[in-house]
């Protein structure tokens, strides 16, 4: 039986532990484990690489999120970077406060998206690893499509909470 969630039904999902990718790219000197320096035609970026069941490349943006044009250019270049064998989803993260993150997402194979649950989890986990956010504290993740809440436990288990919202409706002939 699959549960049906209608508009504004709160949902919670417990993900497996956030994991770090094995070493695959030049490490950033003095940086935390999982950090890497990835260079593209648009510049070099200090990133945090994580797995939330799928690969994520988290780019801290202390000065603000990239513009739509920068998101497209940088997101595509990082998602297809040779360091990622099968590509990676890319999250650009602007820490608004220790309990709030603004995030833009570039999904491998899809491009810019309004929201991404695993991306929100990766963004929060990366900011916890960087010491910007804290474990066991709800972290509000602001995405273009809405707000999700992520909590990282002491053992790196990730809990994602948010509303199930209808984005569109349609019919399919089978």
Q: Language-model segments: which ranges?
A:
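Active-site proximal loop and beta-alpha junction motif in alpha/beta enzyme cores
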Residues: 1-114, 124-174
């Amino acid at each position: 039986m699959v549960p049906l969630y209608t508009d504004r039904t709160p949902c919670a999902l417990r993900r497996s532990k956030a994991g770090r990718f094995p070493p695959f790219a030049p490490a950033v000197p003095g940086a935390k484990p999982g950090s890497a320096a990835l260079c593209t035609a648009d510049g070099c970026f200090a990133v945090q690489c994580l797995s939330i069941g799928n690969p994520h490349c988290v780019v801290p943006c202390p000065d603000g999120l990239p513009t739509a044009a920068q998101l497209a250019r940088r997101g595509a270049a990082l998602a297809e970077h040779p360091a990622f064998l099968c590509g990676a989803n890319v999250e650009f993260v602007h820490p608004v406060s220790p309990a709030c993150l603004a995030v833009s997402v570039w999904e491998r194979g899809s491009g810019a998206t309004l929201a991404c649950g695993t991306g929100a989890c990766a963004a929060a986990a990366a900011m916890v690893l960087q010491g910007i956010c804290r474990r066991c504290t709800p972290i509000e993740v602001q995405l273009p499509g809405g707000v999700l809440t992520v909590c990282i436990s002491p053992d790196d288990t990730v809990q994602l909470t948010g509303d199930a919202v209808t984005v569109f409706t349609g019919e399919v002939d089978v």
